[in-house]
UniProtKB/Swiss-Prot annotation:
Oligomer and partners: Heterodimer of an alpha and a beta chain.
Disordered, as annotated region: 49-75
Species per Swiss-Prot/TrEMBL record: Salmonella arizonae (strain ATCC BAA-731 / CDC346-86 / RSK2980)
One Pfam entry name: Bac_DNA_binding
GO cellular component terms, semicolon-separated: cytosol
A biological-process GO annotation: regulation of DNA-templated transcription
Sorted UniProt keywords: DNA recombination, DNA-binding, Transcription, Transcription regulation, Translation regulation
Protein name: Integration host factor subunit alpha
Alphabetized GO MF terms: DNA binding; structural constituent of chromatin
Top-rank taxon, per record: Bacteria
Organism lineage: Bacteria, Pseudomonadati, Pseudomonadota, Gammaproteobacteria, Enterobacterales
């Protein structure tokens, strides 16, 4: 199961007493600010959680898996996430979830 933005909004509604509309807007604005910073080439550091970084990848050779034809993979910029130490240790120490 995955945590969704709708579930985050519901949690803010339940725990902080925000209206559903305000909770949804808060979640949207939070992620929009992260997107804006990354679009502007900035690193995003969330203390106790982790860092979103931008990496430039060079063009490299690739292969079409259906035809086997060699094709170039174009140079591009990608977003990477590096979890912080607090997040890493919480995940490592969490009890495995039974399915």
């Amino acid at each position: 199961m995955a945590l969704t933005k709708a579930e985050m909004s519901e949690y803010l509604f339940d725990k902080l007493g925000l209206s559903k509309r305000d909770a949804k807007e808060l979640v949207e604005l939070f992620f929009e600010e992260i997107r804006r910073a990354l679009e502007n080439g900035e690193q995003v550091k969330l203390s106790g959680f982790g860092n979103f970084d931008l990496r430039d990848k060079n063009q490299r050779p690739g292969r079409n898996p259906k035809t086997g034809e060699d094709i170039p993979i174009t140079a591009r910029r990608v977003v990477t996430f590096r979890p912080g130490q607090k997040l890493k240790s919480r995940v490592e120490n969490a009890a495995p979830k039974e399915e």
